[in-house]
Regions:
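A short, N-terminal "cap"/entry segment at the start of jelly-roll beta-barrel domains
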Residues: 1-57, 151
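Short acidic-glycine-tyrosine-enriched beta hairpin
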Residues: 96-117
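Short beta-strand segments in beta-sandwich/barrel cores
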Residues: 52, 60-63, 88-94, 112
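Short beta-strand His + acidic residue motifs that chelate non-heme Fe in jelly-roll/DSBH
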Residues: 64, 92-93, 113-115, 120-126, ...
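Double-stranded beta-helix
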Residues: 121-152
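Glycine- and acidic-residue-biased ligand/ion/polar-headgroup-sensing regions
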Residues: 57-58, 77-95
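Conserved short histidine dyad/triad with adjacent acidic residue
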Residues: 53-78
Length: 152
């Protein structure tokens, strides 16, 4: 069984504020011999959406557990979104909160994008494009969740 042994991370910042808006993560290499659990976190602990990659050796188990319900307070919470490309190719465009295009990337199988802030758009490039999408909720409808960026 092959596992990911390293990742290539492209962080995309707001050119005005320097704030991290988006990230593209790609697997770099694969190895068939892993002996210990290794974890690479992609999100700052303060972000609502947490993402990581975990390398797991054969026959390793994680103890069954339940995550505790607790009161949390978030202010000015926006939806954060991740796309994981399972097959095919997808072009992703990244924007600032003001709708300024700041970067583009081609995602292939195994790649993922995270949008913490700012805007994004996706365009499939192959007929076999299949993605997983994860976003923070609760989802209250398009009218409340997003505003579309005008593209010239």
């Amino acid at each position: 069984m092959s596992v990911i042994s390293a990742t290539n991370r492209e962080k995309i910042f707001d050119p005005e504020s320097g704030e991290l808006l988006h990230e593209v993560i790609r697997p770099l290499s694969m190895t068939s011999s892993i002996t210990t659990v290794r974890r690479e976190d992609f999100s700052d602990p303060s972000e609502f959406l947490q993402a990581a990659i975990i390398e797991i050796p054969p026959n390793h188990s994680f103890a069954p557990h339940v995550h505790l319900e607790r009161e949390r307070t978030f202010t000015n919470l926006r939806a954060q979104e991740t796309w994981v490309v399972m097959s095919g190719r997808v072009e992703v465009t990244f924007y600032t909160d003001k709708g300024v295009l700041i970067s583009k990337a081609i995602l292939e199988a195994g790649d993922l994008s995270i949008s913490f802030k700012g805007g994004h758009g996706y365009k499939t490039m192959t007929s076999d494009a299949l993605v997983y999408e994860f976003k923070s909720g609760p989802y209250e409808g398009q009218e409340i969740d997003k505003v579309f960026i005008k593209i010239d």
